[in-house]
UniProtKB/Swiss-Prot annotation:
Its main location: secreted. Residues 1-23 form the signal peptide. This is Serine carboxypeptidase-like 14. Glycans are attached at N103, N344, N376. The gene is SCPL14. Keywords: Carboxypeptidase, Disulfide bond, Glycoprotein, Hydrolase, Protease, Secreted, Signal. Belongs to the peptidase S10 family. One of its GO terms (biological process) is proteolysis. Probable carboxypeptidase. The active site is at S178, D360, H413.
Length: 435
């Protein structure tokens, strides 16, 4: 008799969560922010997958300029498993945390200066299922895959637009960074195929924006050693020995190649004290308020507060501890390379902007340049600096297939390290201006 109790409780939980499918709420106040929000925020869930069992949580922020005509973006954070709230409060959203020692109260939110929502409507989407506040009503669901996530994001966007039909005609872009940069080209392909095969009205798909994106992860990682040499983190002698012994392949090494393995250990000793997401910043303990990464803890304190969850209209019981980047969200990484998707999307005429912070050692700009070269696109504008107030902000190159590469001088793995430069870069590109 007692063995039925856990099953009964599980059934009750599933029935409880089922009642909350496909909901949305307008949020005028957020805990931690003083006064009413100075922008329009909506949160909610859209059910996708078999019988809508996967409930995708989103934050939608209207453009502060002209929401009826400004572009509509869906933003996906990396990981896989990072909540899109990361993008909202740390990268390109209208809110950020006041960085101060946590005292047990709700962390303070403040307005930001360089939000992309000044010129665009943005849906910050928690994906894959399990990231952020997204959840599955099926406790036995298979772990998500890259291609599966691409299909579900396509389904999410179509269902979201069906509930927000005023945005069907807005120019639509898929945006994100890091690991999501590998999946985004596949999402663009899914949406494009849906437009041609099945679905009316069509989504006004125009292109995509990816920041320090994973393309072919092993090759991306291989570029770390040449990058480290280029910025004087390893010696000429070690670099030449690595090239000679490893043949340029540093992430997948023959276990019998003991000389290469030994040299890679020497390399790791040299860079172990480096903060790889932005090598200019110190590597330090996250628990110290003086450490840059301390700000990430504030989002964890904030999102795990019950008052906050009620304000966001998070379904009660749908999520245990919220993690900014939940490493337990393990995905089947079945897209080994995004390059075929880039090529297919360019043939269809979609625009793309590839942003690369030039001091990121996680996905170095050298690897990004290498996979772009492999596309064999003809160059329409040669490598040149792009400027802000007569100062070099980075370098750019434009290709015939509507792809633009832009580095950000002094930038890191994500947009947050150079918010002004990334905001100006995005505004110029999205409006069709020269960088």
């Amino acid at each position: 008799m007692g063995s039925w109790i856990p099953k009964l409780l599980l059934l009750q939980l599933v029935l409880l969560l089922t009642k909350h499918a496909d909901s949305s709420s307008i949020i005028k106040y957020l805990p931690g922010f003083e006064g009413p929000l100075p922008f329009e925020l909506e949160t909610g869930y859209i059910g996708v997958g078999d019988e809508d069992e996967d409930q995708m949580f989103y934050y939608f922020i209207k453009s502060e300029s002209n929401p009826e005509e400004d572009p509509l973006l869906v933003w996906l954070s990396g990981g896989p498993g990072c909540s899109s709230f990361t993008g909202l409060v740390y990268e390109n959203g209208p809110l950020g945390f006041k960085v101060e020692a946590y005292n047990g109260s709700i962390p303070t939110l403040v307005s930001t200066t360089y939000s992309w929502t000044k010129v665009a409507n943005i849906i910050y989407l928690d994906q894959p299922v399990g990231a952020g506040f997204s959840y599955s009503r099926n406790p036995f669901a298979d772990r998500p895959s890259d291609t599966g996530s691409a299909k579900l994001v396509n389904e999410f966007v179509r269902k979201w637009l069906a509930k927000h039909p005023d945005y069907f005609s807005n120019p639509f872009y898929v945006t994100g960074n890091s690991y999501s940069g590998k999946v985004i080209p596949a999402i663009v392909q899914e949406i494009s195929n849906g437009n041609y095969i099945c679905c009316k009205p069509q989504i006004n798909l125009q292109g995509y924006v990816i920041g320090n994106p994973v393309a072919y992860y092993d090759h991306d990682k291989d570029s770390r050693i040449p990058f480290a040499h280029g910025v004087a983190l390893i010696s000429d002698e070690l670099f030449e020995s690595l090239k000679r012994s490893c043949g340029g392949s540093y992430s997948i090494v023959d276990p019998l190649n003991t000389e290469c393995l030994k040299l890679i250990k020497d390399y790791h000793k040299c860079v172990s004290g480096i903060y790889q997401e932005l090598i200019l910043k110190p590597k330090c303990e996250t628990t110290s308020p003086d450490c840059y990464t301390y700000r990430y803890l504030l989002s964890i304190y904030w999102a795990n507060n019950e008052i906050v969850r009620r304000a966001l209209k998070v379904v009660e019981g749908s999520k245990g501890k919220w993690e900014r980047c939940d490493l337990s969200v393990r995905s089947n990484q079945d897209i080994k390379s995004s390059i075929p998707y880039h090529m297919n999307n360019s043939i269809k005429g979609y625009r793309s902007l590839v942003i690369s912070g030039d001091h990121d050692m996680t996905i170095p700009f050298l690897g990004t340049q290498a996979w772009i070269r492999s596309l064999n696109y003809s160059i329409t504008e040669k490598w040149r600096p792009w400027m802000i107030l007569d100062q070099v902000a980075g370098y750019t190159k434009t290709y015939a297939n509507k792809m633009t590469l832009a580095t950000v001088k002094g930038g890191g793995h994500t947009l947050e390290y150079k918010p002004e430069e990334n905001s100006i870069l995005f505004k110029r590109w999205i409006s069709g201006q020269p960088l």
